[in-house]
Every structure is written in structure tokens, then in C-alpha cells.
Amino acid sequence: MKKLLISFIRFYQIFISPLKPPTCRFYPTCSHYGLEAVKRFGAIKGGWLTIKRILKCHPFHPGGFDPVPEKQENGKS
């Protein structure tokens, strides 16, 4: 499932994104955020983080720097 999500995001980056003007108000862009989130957290949590990020991408949100959260190690505070 992780590879499938990564394939969808890469397809978007290669074939769809170049056809649109650059409008992402975040850094990293939503597609780069999605790739990193899925690679770091897997399909379910990474997919959820990506969906939350895309829902914030609208004209009324200021945008800015919004990196993927660091993965927490078990047993460490």
C-alpha cells in the first residue's frame, strides 16, 4: 500500500503538477510533504498526515513552513 501511495504522488508530480501553475502556499509543497510522510510513517499515518495537509491548503490559510513531524521513538520522552 505504501508503494501504491508513493506511485500516485510521483505520478501527480511528473504528469499533472507541471500542467498547473505553482500555487502551493506551503514549504515543502504538499506533494513533497506527502512523499516524505508516507516514507517516514507508512501508508496509514503518512496518508492521514497528507490528507490533513491538503485540507489546510486553501486561500484562507497563511501557509508557510510546515515540515513532516519527526518520528517518535518508542520508550523515549
Swiss-Prot record:
Its main location: membrane. It is found in: Cell membrane. GO terms for cellular component: plasma membrane. It holds the Pfam family YidD. Keywords: Cell membrane, Membrane. Could be involved in insertion of integral membrane proteins into the membrane. HAMAP family: UPF0161_YidD. This is Putative membrane protein insertion efficiency factor. It comes from Geobacillus sp. (strain WCH70). The lineage of its organism: Bacteria, Bacillati, Bacillota, Bacilli, Bacillales.
